[in-house]
Amino acid sequence: MKQKPLAIVGAGKIGTMICRFLLSCGDYRVTLIDASAEQLRRIPDEPGLEKRVLDVADHDGFTQALQGHFAVLSATPYFMTEQIAKAAVAAKVHY
């Protein structure tokens, strides 16, 4: 079965748990996106995991990072929802 590319925004406790679960099931390749390089460094490298330091406030960069993914999941505070949704629409990915 081909793995679906999925982006997760937010590498805190919730985002990391979602990431680990999706990687463990074997159906997804995960791009974990966070504005904090330090936060991403805390997460061990795993097959199928790509980590990207990126701020969702960078609309163009974030939109470009989402392209080619099946969907994006948010594990960020509620006030980031609009920015993530706009980038998902622009990149034509599910949110």
Locations of regions flagged by a protein language model:
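Aromatic pocket-lining residues of Rossmann-like dinucleotide-binding sites
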Residues: 22-23
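Conserved N-terminal Rossmann-fold NAD(P)-binding element of oxidoreductases
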Residues: 6-10
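Hydrophobic/small residue at the entry helix of a nucleotide-binding pocket
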Residues: 14-15
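Short beta-strand element of Class I
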Residues: 29-31
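Conserved Rossmann-fold cofactor-binding substructure of NAD(P)-dependent oxidoreductases
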Residues: 53-71, 75-76, 80-83
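Helix N-cap at the beta1-alpha1 junction of Rossmann-like dinucleotide-binding domains, i.e.
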Residues: 36-39
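Short acidic/histidine-rich motifs immediately flanking catalytic phosphotransfer sites
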Residues: 46-47, 66-71, 91
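Beta-strand-loop-alpha-helix segment that lines the small-molecule cofactor/substrate pocket
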Residues: 85-95
